[in-house]
Amino acid sequence: EHARIRLFWASAEQGMYGETRPAVFEGHLGAEVYVRPSPLPVNGDRLLRDTVVYLTCLHESGHALGLAHTAVFEDIMYSFQYGGDFNEYFGRYRRKLETRADIAKNPGMSAADRARLVEILKR
């Protein structure tokens, strides 16, 4: 209950895959992260569904920590407002996985994402 970043599973009726909203908890700035997990496999592929949910959680958590969108397709903070191939964005990560446990071995952040996060956390 004291966490400054809180994750919520959003319903399909909310019409979002992921969204981060600023919030104040006990007088401290924080964030509410909303992610809509699909209950069904994407194109019959459960690992692709897990990929979309994981990368969306990671992206939205990045916002909660202060990371902004980038125009670099390799970054987790990439925004599709710049275009880009949705299927390839998630597919390149999915191709690294044989099982759900492989997600723990493949963090999904680029070196640039990590460098920006380190700079934010130093402040």
Where are these regions (language model features)?
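Metzincin-family zinc-dependent endopeptidase catalytic domain
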Residues: 1-72, 82
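The catalytic-center signature of Zn2+-dependent metalloproteases
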Residues: 47-122
